[in-house]
Amino acid sequence: MKPINIQDQFLNQIRKDNTFVTVFLLNGFQLRGQVKGFDNFTVLLETEGKQQLIYKHAISTFAPQKNVNLELE
């Protein structure tokens, strides 16, 4: 049985759905936008046509504007 990677499923679903998300950083700063891509270490966030590459180790929380449907089975 293949292990479930919730992080990748979550990020991929909000990317595919173009869901707006608030990203809370460890320093308390908040970024709002859409996830355009991600890898093991970074997340590419687009806000008002501008891109920001955020390192995952700096992220505390993702708060999407709507619920994300995941296939956890």
Curated annotation (Swiss-Prot):
This is RNA-binding protein Hfq. GO terms for biological process: regulation of DNA-templated transcription; regulation of RNA stability; regulation of translation, ncRNA-mediated. PANTHER family: RNA-BINDING PROTEIN HFQ. PROSITE patterns: SM. Homohexamer. The keyword RNA-binding applies. GO terms for cellular component: cytosol. Coiled coil: none annotated. It comes from Bacillus pumilus (strain SAFR-032). Signal peptide: none annotated. The gene is hfq. GO terms for molecular function: RNA binding. InterPro entries: Hfq, LSM_dom_sf, Sm. Keywords: RNA-binding, Stress response. Residues 8-68 form the Sm domain. Belongs to the Hfq family. Transmembrane segments: none annotated. RNA chaperone that binds small regulatory RNA (sRNAs) and mRNAs to facilitate mRNA translational regulation in response to envelope stress, environmental stress and changes in metabolite concentrations. Also binds with high specificity to tRNAs.
